[in-house]
Amino acid sequence: MKTFIGTGVGQPEAAVHQAVQGLTSPSAILFMASYEHFKETASRLKELFPDTPCIGTIGTRLVNGQVNDSGLAVLGFFSDVKIRCGIITEASRCPVAGTTQLLKQIAEISPGTDDTVCVE
């Protein structure tokens, strides 16, 4: 599996610029940012990669042997990875409402028992 890992520090514009240096044509992006910069980071990544599914999270991250609570980490996936993304709506009121769509997306990628990850 071909992947890209990039990191950036500072305000979202600078951090995103640093983190995506060398990232071209990803099939999907997973990013980890600080809570205070999360929204702007997501917006900037979407501007740069408008047709790429992008999933973000907050929290402590371990990248290249460094543990960090601030800054940005970007993980890019490429065409050798099958990706399906969606939004689970009504999660607080009726979490099973999105089950049909989720099962459809899972079937589309033909998951195996040792080569599949589901990120919630």
Residues covered by each model-derived region:
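Cofactor- and metal-binding active-site motifs of prokaryotic enzymes
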Residues: 1-120
